[in-house]
């Protein structure tokens, strides 16, 4: 009797062992995102951002970003453009280390700058994204007024599990993470 049970128990046992060894692999492939710390942002974002042919000072206290479990960031900071040729053209510097679509604008890993103009009605911003090195425009997205009362922030990049929004003042643009 025990000889007949052995093959019947070994095969299912082996199958369960194989499945249990694959579970950690599947869990490891799921990427989680969290808010980046001030120290992480300070080590990632430059004190002077390379924008076209200039190095424009950044205001680190406005830095915001997210980081995934693989150490890839999406982070930005306000540019201090007074006195530079970028004045009135760009307001923020953005580093993207994983593909992302911001309000319909697809951004590959790289460095970008963006600026905005307010809609005539005042309820939206037209946000234009440019490559930081060349100034070439990548696309334009619309940031909408955040409904209700919210904290006004120069820049806040929310983790996707919370809101999947990039907040600029009282306005926000939704984003979607892409695959690398």
Give the location of each predicted region.
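N-terminal secretory signal peptides that target proteins for export/translocation
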Residues: 1-7
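Bacterial N-terminal signal peptides
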Residues: 12-21
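Primarily secretory-pathway and cell-envelope proteins
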Residues: 26-85, 133-180
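Extracytoplasmic
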Residues: 72-74, 87-91, 107-109, 122-124
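Conserved interaction-surface patches within small, structured recognition/assembly domains
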Residues: 91-101
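A short tyrosine-centered beta-strand micro-motif
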Residues: 108-117
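Compact nucleic-acid interaction/catalytic patches
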Residues: 116-137, 144
């Amino acid at each position: 009797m025990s000889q007949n049970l052995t093959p019947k128990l070994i095969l299912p046992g082996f199958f369960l062992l194989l499945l249990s060894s694959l579970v950690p692999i599947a869990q490891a492939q799921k990427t989680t995102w969290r808010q980046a710390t001030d120290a992480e942002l300070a080590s990632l974002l430059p004190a002077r951002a390379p924008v076209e042919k200039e190095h424009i000072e950044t205001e680190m206290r406005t830095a915001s970003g997210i980081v995934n479990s693989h150490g890839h960031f999406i982070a930005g900071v306000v540019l201090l453009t007074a006195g530079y040729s970028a004045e009135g053209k760009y307001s923020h510097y953005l580093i993207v280390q994983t593909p992302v679509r911001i309000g319909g604008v697809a951004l590959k890993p790289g460095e970008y700058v963006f600026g905005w103009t307010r809609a005539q009605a005042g309820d939206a911003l037209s946000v234009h994204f440019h490559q930081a090195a060349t100034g070439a425009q990548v696309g334009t997205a619309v940031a909408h007024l955040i409904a209700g009362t919210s904290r006004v922030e120069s820049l806040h990049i929310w983790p996707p599990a919370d809101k999947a929004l990039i907040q600029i003042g009282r306005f926000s643009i939704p984003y979607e993470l892409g695959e690398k």
